[in-house]
Amino acid sequence: DPRSLWLAAAALLSARPTLAPGPQLLTRARALVQLPAHTVAPPSHTVAPPSHPRPLADRTAHGGLLFVVPLLRHLGIDAFLAAHPALADAELPLHILHDIATRCGAPPDDPLRLALGAPSLDLPHTPIHDERLLAAAGPIRLRDTPPALALFRAALRRHVRRGARIGLRTLVVRPARVWSSRTHLDLGFAMDLVDLGIRRIGADLHPGHVPWLGRMIHFHHGHQHF
């Protein structure tokens, strides 16, 4: 629909500020959402409903799992994946999300986990020498866990504890409604679940287009979405 096309164009401009508005931008935006050509409508100033919703939204008790996405960006996962193509091919971010979901008690049939989909490859035990990630994770014992998974998990725990004064489980375990499609993933939270500590670390801010998950991700707060 026009709103999805506009969001895709905005995501492309955010990712590539040098890309000029024009026919080329619209072509790339249409390719992103695979929509037929039509006029782009300007965004509404009212609160818009989640994009591409199912007729009935599913409910999850672990809606905060996707709050991990902005934090992974903060930890530099985009550059990390570019420097470690084997881990990118094995869908490291999906491994991280499902590992955290399991540790926080989300069952395999949780609607959000099903919407994300499972990684298709096992994660290789690639040695990690990324100084930024090693510093963020602090000293840890790797044991039998793939190093990249263990390091990002430790770095996330440390960042959430220091910045929001909560544990990773407290971040993740929060009820939400889930709308999903092949290109979009929207979560709706009750307004009274807004947490200043979580906002302070930017975990509940819209991720927008997330290339390593292949989705446009948006968070909605308010009882009309929950």
Predicted regions and their residues:
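Short, compositionally biased pre-sequence/patch detector
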Residues: 1-226
